[in-house]
Amino acid sequence: MSKLVKTTVASSAIAIISYKLGDQIFNLIGNFFTDNLLAKIEIDSSLNPKLFFAIKTELEKFVDSSKLLKINDFGSQIRYELNVGFYKIKTRKHGWIFVNYVDNKLILYKLPKISFFPPQIKKQTNRLKKFIDSVHSISCRPDEMRMCYTSNNNNWSYPIIRRPCKFLDSNLTTEMRSVLKDVDVFMRNEDTYRELGANYRRGMLLYGESGCGKTGLISIISNKYGMDSYILNLNSKDMSDSVLISLASNVKARSILVIEEIDKQIETLNANGNKNVSIGGLLSALDGPQGLAHVLCYNDSQCDIFFQQITWKL
């Protein structure tokens, strides 16, 4: 009986090893085939977030809705997105395109016609490039895409990408119109700032009770002028004046640097005894980058002297 058990265990082990070895050989053959015999272009989400988002969205148009199994609840409604896997789509101009979605990457393949000789592979690679160019020209325009970054330690995180929302002009309040007029003057007078030797940036303090439209106004500014948003958290891990200045210096020109609920953030800093972040450090950070709109949001209908001083210095 013992001998039979040993034989069974040994056979099972050999079977598992054979299965693993066969699986590795299959993967090696598959990788060799796709890497050397197919036209191939790889798109990394961390390096090309806009293009990755655009092609993934385009791919979702061709895929049956039953395959949209990944849930995204960032927003007012739940959205079902594409899960990782292998897909194929048929385009009118570029024929069949195969897409492998894995590990935050999209790997696009195109099968060469007739033969696998280099000229055919090059031809199909060019067709892949034309497909990517067409998606980029349509879906990656400033008026079609907004990037929203959040601070993560001493870096800006992978962006949240959104399609611009449309706002009815009739829904704008008098105060909102006043702010938009101010931003419009700022955006149209860069040359005037330069001629006067003034720093080209604009600081705004939006204040009011929660739900009065401060965040919505930031979205309107972002959409109207094609500006990406950078959300700064003063209480993130390892935050200090030097990290604050480094983050601000890495914000791209023609963007909005936002500090939401600055009153609550400063209260939290004081409550935690955080002495690494100071008002002086905040002002120094905001004093550096050019071509930005700085927006501080304060959740109260009354601004005290302290916040008025910050507004004046901005």
UniProtKB/Swiss-Prot annotation:
Disulfide bonds: none
Single Gene Ontology MF annotation: ATP hydrolysis activity
InterPro entries: ATPase_AAA_core, Mitochondrial_chaperone_BCS1, P-loop_NTPase
Signal peptide: none
PANTHER family given in the database record: BCS1 AAA-TYPE ATPASE
Name the record gives this protein: Uncharacterized protein R776
Lineage of the organism: Viruses, Varidnaviria, Bamfordvirae, Nucleocytoviricota, Megaviricetes
